[in-house]
Amino acid sequence: MSKKGDSSDHLRCSFCGKNQDEVKKLIAGPAVYICDECIELCNEIIAEETEKGAVDSEFQDIPSPKEIKAMLDEYVIEQDHAKKVLSVAVYNHYKRLDTAFDSKDVDIQKSNVLLIGPTGSGKTLLAQTLARFLDVPFTIADATALTEAGYVGEDVENIILSLLQNADYDVERAKRGIVYIDEIDKIARKSDNPSITRDVSGEGVQQALLKIVEGTTASVPPKGGRKHPQQDFVKVDTSNILFICGGAFNGLAELIQRRQGEKVMGFGAKVQTKTDMKIGDLLVQTRPEDLLKFGLIPEFVGRLPVIATLGELGEESLVRILTEPKNALVKQFQKLFEMEGVKLRFTDSALSAIAKGALDRKSGARGLRAIVEKAMLDIQYEIPSMENVKECVIGEEVVMHGEDPILLFEPSKKKA
């Protein structure tokens, strides 16, 4: 009950001692009183403790590197080295955030990651799977769409805006999110000599990205954007955001081979040609100096201390990708057909044909879905209207030449 109107002089807040005339409200309890100011202070203390407890709980639940890799194994085939490197880097990153809350005596640097590998080798999938497993906000940006501020194109701050949107405008969650920047190799400068002219989509973009990658306070439009120009911009500290950059880096293997060739010159030196070594074996030996020669600026290379390389995927690997992961294409289509009461089966030769098609397109795992969708289009159109179909068998001819699949009907209802 409120005692604001009570004229008794002895009514005071039991916590701060102020009398009823010095506060807005005085709430009475059994032999005690509390004022509105003390209530507000108590609410602030409780909110701070609750937030700190939630953060502490979040960091105590960080999975170990082995647990992270085991989860990645469920969705990404092969690439064990990259998965191990990424697992350790992500674990250390979130432990670093934990340390930031508990200790101020050691400054642990952020472990941003550079993923190097051919198109369709699993770079984007690794980043997506990590973010989903860790339950943190995640966004993907295309480096080729970015330009320096003042030029037509996407500003680098838009990356943080996208992350904030995916965090439902929860700034604290966004500050612990993961950003994946794809096609990072496409913003390399044209030579390893500093440019004296404007490079709107190359060196200039690297300089712009450098600020948010190393840690800055980015100003992004509020919810509603330009519809509410009177609103203040939202400030997001990027110091604790994990940045994962990925690219195919075509031509990097040749730079590495050239560097190695210079060091093995002389009598009796064993020289390995490009045919002797796979591109993946060369990329594993990537050094910062190779990235500098490729066209990344020194400051940007320095902000990506962890390098993980992914190898090329062969036919056998692509077949495994079609069938083994939790989100495997074959499993997805089998589930869709199961909903129609039909068992779907792909022959081994059909799976090999799909894998070979992706290899011919030089698109890696990324090209698998387009090939499968094309092969399955007609039968997906027909099956819902057909009766008594028990099983559908997809053979090599369906994939290669668009022939009809084999349909097996219920024996008792099979028509002559």
UniProtKB/Swiss-Prot annotation:
GO biological process: cell division; proteolysis involved in protein catabolic process
GO molecular function, one term: ATP binding
Record keywords, A-Z: ATP-binding, Chaperone, Metal-binding, Nucleotide-binding, Zinc
Amino acids binding Zn(2+): C13, C16, C35, C38
Assembly and oligomerization: Component of the ClpX-ClpP complex. Forms a hexameric ring that, in the presence of ATP, binds to fourteen ClpP subunits assembled into a disk-like structure with a central cavity, resembling the structure of eukaryotic proteasomes.
SMART domains noted in UniProt: AAA, ClpB_D2-small, zf-C4_ClpX
Keyword flag Chloroplast: no
Keyword set includes Nucleotidyltransferase: no
Positions annotated to bind ATP: P118, T119, G120, S121, G122, K123, T124, L125
Protein name, entry field: ATP-dependent Clp protease ATP-binding subunit ClpX
Domain ClpX-type ZB: 1-54
UniProt function note: ATP-dependent specificity component of the Clp protease. It directs the protease to specific substrates. Can perform chaperone functions in the absence of ClpP.
Pfam families, A to Z: AAA_2, ClpB_D2-small, zf-C4_ClpX
Gene Ontology CC terms, in alphabetical order: HslUV protease complex
InterPro entries reported in the protein's UniProt record: AAA+_ATPase, ATP-dep_Clp_protease_ClpX, ATPase_AAA_core, Clp_ATPase_C, Clp_protease_ATP-bd_su_ClpX, ClpX_bact, P-loop_NTPase, Znf_CppX_C4
